[in-house]
């Protein structure tokens, strides 16, 4: 049974906070502010969360996946759709970095890169900005980023691995492919969410 929650304008969507091995799936941010945009932070992680899978979720075009500092790690954003706007991941400057190692973005469909001030983050996107206390993400694995065009900084230490930027890859879902490989099948509960 599917339930829908509509809120006008708020700060965060759904997140795993201080937890391990959490699955967040099929969440769609349909809230809207005066500009028609959703939450400040999309689905994601906060505090020392680890091993989180964020699967097939959508968030606003001027948002970002949530990575709310205090050292979350080992997070998979899998086949999600939404904005890729720096600083909208969240977290206080005293709690940086926003994310430690093993952040993987798999088949992220980027729908927007412009923040509320009109700053466009579509080119030379940096994950670790040495000149800014608010944006510190350890070099992620980024595969199959597509949708709105984005280029990532090629400076040393910005990416652990990058592949097929601008093109959706197969398998569509890394999480589903791993389950198929490990279990020999994709569980019925996950198929039902599709």
What name fits each language-model region?
Residues 2-7:
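Short, small-residue-biased leader/transition segments that mark boundaries at the very start
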Residues 152, 156-194:
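Long, low-hydrophobicity, solvent-exposed regions enriched in small/turn-prone and acidic residues
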Residues 8-169:
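Glycine- and acidic/polar-rich repeat regions and solenoidal domains
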